[in-house]
UniProtKB/Swiss-Prot annotation:
E.C. no: 2.7.7.6
Domain remark from Swiss-Prot or TrEMBL: The N-terminal domain is essential for RNAP assembly and basal transcription, whereas the C-terminal domain is involved in interaction with transcriptional regulators and with upstream promoter elements.
Keywords: DNA-directed RNA polymerase, Nucleotidyltransferase, Transcription, Transferase
NCBIfam families in the record: PRK05182.1-2, PRK05182.2-5, rpoA
Protein name from the UniProt record: DNA-directed RNA polymerase subunit alpha
Tagged with keyword Metal-binding: no
Function: DNA-dependent RNA polymerase catalyzes the transcription of DNA into RNA using the four ribonucleoside triphosphates as substrates.
Length: 333
């Protein structure tokens, strides 16, 4: 197989093996020799450190002043309860922080299903055990759930407000990442007479709040955005004003008609002045459900179509709409 020294192979075979709802194996081949480790390690680091998610950041338990306490009638001590709270898989739809309550008494197991949820909060693992109560036991607590990224120790959230914080509000080290495990291996691949190529196999497991395939797409998008600066690398010999407009993904400038939604969904979006994909992804699920004639079926359709393009609802665009889009709108008018 003859090829130019400036031409590189790109994966022509992509296989996604769904092992379980929370685990998948993604295989890409062929890759030039060495690119398996280059891409695999970069994606692995992003998946572990940069995926946004939700976690319990603070807990307030009735009758507890500090984490080294014990609660009468509760099998676990407070430290064990806090560790169990870290295992909750929570999704927030439309909000960055929410306070939840849990109240249970009498003999039995306290699970995530006992937490009282708001309409825009979802717990993916309702069977997750938090504590075990005896007949005389009772557990009442408030949980603060926040959206974040990566790992955040409790002391990093300390501020001047700590002095005024009431005693008994326990801070938790929080792992926001929905990725529970990520591993990759590089195997040999062959294309015609070339036998020194790479095959990248990524084994990814999440906590259920994020689909494994979507996690890969988001990680690849982050990597692409970070590398974009190197593509148009320029020196600082002249002061250059960098317009945020240049960083906008071209797909966001396309009309929502390009998503090929059903007529009902498309008309509902236009009725809300949502004409571009960039307009759509900034809306939350809660906001869209308030749209007349747009139900959960249409919402699911919109989410699936966006996910197929590596996008999702509730994304933030600081520089939207871009100046060029405004000019086009004026010209059309």
């Amino acid at each position: 197989m003859q090829s130019s020294v400036n031409e590189f192979l790109t994966p022509r075979h992509i296989d996604v093996q769904v092992v379980s709802p929370t685990r998948a194996k993604i295989t890409l081949e062929p890759l030039e020799r060495g690119f398996g480790h280059t891409l695999g390690n970069a994606l692995r680091r992003i998946l572990l450190s940069s995926m946004p998610g939700c976690a319990v950041v603070e807990a307030e338990i009735d009758g507890v002043l500090h984490e080294y306490s014990a609660i009468e009638g509760v099998q676990e001590d407070v430290i064990e309860i806090l560790l169990n709270l870290k295992g909750l898989a929570i999704k927030l739809h439309g909000r960055d922080e929410v306070t939840l309550t849990l109240s249970k008494k009498g003999s039995g197991v306290v699970t995530a299903a006992d937490i009282q949820l708001d309409h825009d909060v979802e717990i993916v693992n309702p069977d997750h055990v938090i504590a075990n109560l005896a007949s005389n036991g009772a557990l009442n607590m408030k949980l603060v759930v926040a959206r974040g990224r990566g790992y955040e120790p409790a002391d990093s959230r300390q501020s001047d407000e700590d002095e005024s914080r009431s005693i008994g509000r326990l801070q938790l080290d929080s792992s926001f990442s929905p990725v529970r495990r990520i591993a990759y291996v590089v195997e040999n691949a062959r294309v015609e007479q070339r036998t020194n190529l790479d095959k990248l196999v990524i084994d990814l497991e999440t906590n259920g709040t994020l689909d494994p395939e979507e996690a890969i797409r988001r990680a690849a998008t982050i990597l692409q955005q970070q590398l974009a600066a190197f593509v148009d690398l320029k020196g600082d010999s002249e002061p250059v004003v960098v317009e945020q407009e240049d960083e906008i993904d071209p797909i966001l400038l396309r009309p929502v008609d390009d998503l090929e939604l059903t007529v009902r969904s498309a008309n509902c979006l236009k009725a809300e002045n949502i004409y571009y994909i960039g307009d759509l992804i900034q809306r939350t699920e809660v906001e869209l459900l308030k749209t007349p004639n747009l139900g959960k079926k249409s919402l699911t359709e919109i989410k699936d179509v966006l996910a197929s393009r590596g996008l999702s609802l509730g994304m933030r665009l600081d520089n939207w709409p871009p100046a060029s889009l405004k000019k086009d709108d004026k010209a059309t008018a």
